[in-house]
Design a protein with these regions (language model features):
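Rossmann-like NAD(P)(H) cofactor-binding subdomain of soluble oxidoreductases
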Residues: 1-33
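Alpha-helix initiation and N-capping motif
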Residues: 5, 89, 137-141
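Internal alpha-helical scaffold of NAD(P)-dependent oxidoreductase catalytic cores
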Residues: 11-16, 31, 35-136
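Short, solvent-exposed loop/turn elements at beta->coil junctions and helix N-caps
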Residues: 24, 74-77, 144-145
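C-terminal active-site/capping subdomain that shapes the small-molecule cofactor and substrate pocket
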Residues: 128-153
């Protein structure tokens, strides 16, 4: 467990701390105009692992109101899943001064940028494996592929 989760648990009690992650991908085109690029689910679970009644209740409530949320038995792995996509999108967007749409979707050289993004993710996977997070290549590429292959709405 990272230090900040331990601090939160110490302050409010372990029973009050859940883990979770969400990924929303969009661009603001102008006042009142937003392009959504990824309808990805959010994940929630007991921080130390497992799905409890409260996790199921929260997941079902959010999903009922239009934000898909999945009860996760291994929320630490889900956090890594998000990190995989972020390692490929954030740094390359900054280096090339392009948002993720310009870099991976509307780019005539998107096959080059996508391959570079995938290589970054596979390198990040090595770190996850060293940290004891078991994740396949397909799993670590899942969120990245959902974002870069998504239809813009």
């Amino acid at each position: 467990m990272r230090k900040f989760e331990a601090i939160m648990q110490k302050i409010v009690g372990k029973e009050k701390v859940l883990g979770g992650t969400t990924t929303q991908a969009s661009n603001i085109l102008g006042p009142g105009h937003i392009k959504n690029h990824a309808a990805l689910p959010s994940w929630i679970g007991e921080y130390d692992g497992g799905v409890s009644e409260r996790v199921n209740m929260i997941s079902e409530t959010f999903s009922a109101y239009g934000l898909e949320m999945i009860a996760a038995d291994d929320v630490k792995k889900r956090k890594w899943m998000k990190l995989f996509a972020l390692t490929a999108i954030g740094p390359l967007s900054a280096i090339f001064d392009l948002n993720h749409t310009e870099l991976y979707i509307d780019n005539k050289n998107q096959s080059i940028s996508r391959n570079l993004g995938k290589e970054i993710i596979l390198e990040t996977r090595k770190v996850a494996l060293a940290e004891g997070i078991e994740v396949s290549e397909d799993e670590c590429l899942f969120m990245f592929n959902k974002i870069v292959d998504s239809k813009q709405t």
